[in-house]
Amino acid sequence: MATTTQRRLEPTSIRKFGTGLGQFDLPDLTALQTVSYAAFLQEDAASNARKDHGLESVLREIFPIASYDGNTTLEYLYYELGKPRYTIQECRQLRLTYGRPLRIWLRLNREEPIEEEVYLGDLPIMLGGGEFIINGAERVVVSQLHRSPGVDFVLEQDTTTDRKLPSCRVIPERGSWIEVNVTKKDALTVRIDQSGKFAATMLLRAMDPKYSTDADLLSAFYETGTIKVNGGKDATKIENKIAVDDVVYPSGHERAGEIIVEAGYKITTELSETICNAGVTSVEAMDLPKVPLIFNTLADDNTASHEEALLRIYQRLRPGNPPQLEKARTLFQEKFYDDNRYRLGKVGRFRLNRKLGLGVEETVMTLRPDDMIAAIRYLIDLFDADSGAEIDDIDHLGNRRLRTIDELASEELRKGFLKLRRTVQERMSVKDAQDMTPRSLINPKSVSAAIDFFFGRGELSQVVDQTNPLSQLAHERRLSALGPGGLNRKRAGFEVRDVHISHYGRICPIETPEGTNIGLISSLAIYAGVDDYGFLCTPFRKVIDGKISDETVWLRADEEGESYVAPADTEVKDGALVPGPNMIARFRSDFEIVMPEQVSFMDVAPAQMVGVSAGLIPFLEHDDANRALMGSNMQRQAVPLLVTEPPIVGTGMEREVAKNSAMVVRARRAGKVTYADATRIEIGSDHYPLKKYQGLNERTCQNQKPLITVGDKVEKGQIIADGAATQKGELALGRNVLVGFMSFDGFNYEDAIIISEELVRNDTYTSIHIEDFDVEIRETKLGREEFTRDIPNVSEKALRNLDDTGIVQTGTYVKPGDILVGKVSPKSKTELTPEEKLLHAIFGRAGEDVKNDSLEVPSGIEGIVIDTQKFSRRMSLGEDERKAFERELKQHETEGNEEIASTFESLIRDMEEASGVKLKDSTGTPLADGQDPKFVAERATSFRLELVLEQIEDEEKRKAAEKVHQTQWQNVEQAIDERDRKLNSMKRGDELRSGVLQMVKIYIATKRTISVGDKMAGRHGNKGVIAKILPIEDMPFLPDGTPIQIMLNPLGVPSRMNVGQILETHLGWAGAKLGFQALTPIFDGASESEINDCLAEAGLPAHGKIRLTDGRTGEPMEQETTVGYIYMLKLHHLVDDKVHARSTGPYSLITQQPLGGKARFGGQRFGEMEVWALEAYGAAYILQELLTVKSDDVEGRTKIYESMVKGENTLEAGTPASFDVLTNEIRGLALNMQLEKRPI
């Protein structure tokens, strides 16, 4: 019989398939989060060298704050971030936020300026690849994909005429939207936000006095000129022209000053003769335009000046207010020219310039009148179909951009600082000038509340999916179109959800949820990056005259639009593209056969178009897209197993995913391993504590194991310890199992899976899950609660696992109902039952005043207690407790000093080695002389580098010593901070929630072996539920006697069109036989002929089929079966978490029916359709029982319980409580409904 060691596959070599074109180095997969948050904080930059970005930008925008009278101003100088008060572990255990204090330096300008530091709250610290610890839980802020600020031109269907009319929207980063539409009467109208429509020329008049008159507006859009006329003979010169300005009778004429032709009107033959005969010498005119939009708009515009236009727009925006010119001017100024209220933003200005061909500086953030003129000109060109103007595709990634955490956090903090500004101005007006200080003016709660809301409760702040390393990495790279300022899933249409050609290399076309969020939640492609404007870009190799250059360029979607892009697997010879019928290139959304000279760019890798999860699916190109979507989503649900194993058939991405995941440990610096065990690793002066059996967000288990031994040399960034679901630094989500695609007595009907008992016996798919429970002690009105072993009315047997303080002992195996922590609460005197009163009268008053409030193991949980932790506030201590506390404090101080002394002496020795000088302090005592640790720690605290460098005369050696100090001093600082933090923490006690005096946390490890009902899946979307576990002897076996481990239904392949699983099976079989791991990158992997060659080399049939023998009968199977090794995952949908049965439990107060759901220990709903089923069978008594005594007949429940106790089989059904609710509802409608009971 096969044993674990025989069936565990250990490949001895690696075979890489494909052309090897995907050698382009992968970028840092977590950069989307880490780089943007670093840009937001700018913590490494000097306070006076910070860019106007992120937090710095918000502070510069809000400050200075001036008082209402202008006499006092509060100026911002700089900000600094302190050190965190708590460790990561403390924050997890005590449900705190892991952050660092934000302090800003402010100057209050009055008669005597005051500079002061003000604390504004804690800013969360980013861990790993983008997680924050907020209130004890790890969260991530998902990046938002939204419609970019700028100008968009679209065609909209007119419902009455069926014409497609162009419209334009000017969308700012902050402020009012302006929408310009072409009406069915061929005029231009404008809407500001949701205001009523008015003529577009009215807005232009209001924006700038230089566009006050019709002549000014016509001159802005068309070529105009002055035509000289002299008598009637020149009448033809101005005939059929358009008058740009009013033509009036000249002075000296009997009708002097009267208008002959108004501006914007056509000069007819009759009018031209009148003008010439009247003695007019010159006419401002223009040719009749092809598109009459402006003329039609001027005809609709009943304003004639700048002031009149302002008043009309004011009436539209404030319909109820009386029109006043100054108020109208102020409103218009605030709406479009005030930086605080209207801001196009850097991106908006960039897009305006790009679309309209403007060359305006990007620092100009407001909308200029010339911008609106240019936008309307473009709209006129769109109306003229022959002009070549193009409408915008709003789903194109050139028009959608990414808002990363720096922008999202800045926006939320800005709201908090605006509240702060109002508060400061109010306080300035009521406080006496002499008593004012920055601290007395600032209320930090408005800022800290904004920080707490954004990171803790914001729509884009989500609890990290930590099922396995891939799920965490994928969550950090997720893009959402939902959230504040984004789309609504109910109103989002098909177009915005669909895959777009501009997604190529930027957004994964495969990875997206299957439900209502499909297409709205997406994932970043492997090589994609974000540029300074927030647009997604992807790398390409530059091709010049058919030759591939070494230059790599990162292009936005709009930059790529007009170029031919060759795929990565294009045939190349001597660095040049090979012409021929196979020379294809992508141009926009089409592939064309082209000449090499036409190609401008080339993909950097075949896997460029997909995301991380899809990049892990071997033979992805042979799978249907729907199944690939399921495969990439289900890999994120794979549970980390007890014994990990990388896939025999991989894509080469497995190592990259593990390396970029926060679950493994990577070396911060190169060096030599000085210490390594299961709990910590030391490389020189760097210390790496390892996490042991730590529960993650999804209750999966993180247990880090070292990969190196003492004496090994490691490089910077090398993986030195494995985490959950990794092996030797490679992602290992499942196990390689021997599969047979065959039906088996119908047990694998409808995708059900049959597995061998061998997988259960050998713990192949066993996983560990960590559950944590906590219980708190509070001060109640009746007295204080207490942890104790002395619990009333509880047997000694139930207390056997508790220690003297009432806490369960580590290592105890617990089951549902077992006591984890003994706790008693004060009990009100009125709560005593008559029986208790009698007992207290007989046995005295002991135990009378407390009730049992212990923490018990809930149903469905069974396992071993792996850790218990007790936290308490530092309260008044007794004499013995105080002495014990002082001893512990002294011990921690000694340990801290020893750690500081060790790191400091290591630094000094390395500096002495680099300089060749014995370094001394100011008294002449050697710095590293192995003295008392306390003395050395004090010396380290007061250490000054310049005093030491003065002792080194040689310039080069001084620089070498300084370099050693730069690399190692932070370890000394870290040791000092750790000692001080630990001592301060002990002195002040644990930071528990308000009202909590003590808290105990219990961690239970549950071992889950694979069982019937568990969900399993491959990487190709081939999922199923285990229907049967067969004994090993009943499983079909190969000719050499090896039993099959898992049987899948062959009908699951053709209709699902995921043939990749069959290719994986064949190559996996060859790999297992020959002892190699196959790396077959997507779109550039092993071909069919290469797989056949591998099978032949292994001595296996070329078609991958073999005749199996039935283990039950010993007879050979009738047909040959496809057999091989496939990588199968156990998913997080475990049957143990879902199976639930109710005996007695809570009832709904109103209907008196049992509650629903496992969490509430609810019942199974017997619904309408189930009632029909019993009615169809005529099972009247069963139905009566289900709808009354088993549900909400309160009296009937009591009676049937009594009859069961007496052993009688009687059923007396009464009226269901829900029926009483119905009758009361009807009576509430003033209908007198009465029940009449008749004997049956």
UniProtKB/Swiss-Prot annotation:
Reaction catalysis annotation: RNA(n) + a ribonucleoside 5'-triphosphate = RNA(n+1) + diphosphate
GO cellular component annotations of the record: DNA-directed RNA polymerase complex
Enzyme class: transferase
EC numbers on record: 2.7.7.6
Keywords: DNA-directed RNA polymerase, Nucleotidyltransferase, Transcription, Transferase
GO molecular function: DNA binding; DNA-directed RNA polymerase activity; ribonucleoside binding
CDD domains: RNA_pol_B_RPB2
BP GO annotations: DNA-templated transcription
One Pfam family here: RNA_pol_Rpb2_2
Binding partners and assembly: The RNAP catalytic core consists of 2 alpha, 1 beta, 1 beta' and 1 omega subunit. When a sigma factor is associated with the core the holoenzyme is formed, which can initiate transcription.
Functional description taken from the UniProt entry: DNA-dependent RNA polymerase catalyzes the transcription of DNA into RNA using the four ribonucleoside triphosphates as substrates.
Protein name as catalogued: DNA-directed RNA polymerase subunit beta
Organism name: Rhodopirellula baltica (strain DSM 10527 / NCIMB 13988 / SH1)
Lineage of origin: Bacteria, Pseudomonadati, Planctomycetota, Planctomycetia, Pirellulales
Recorded name of the encoding gene: rpoB
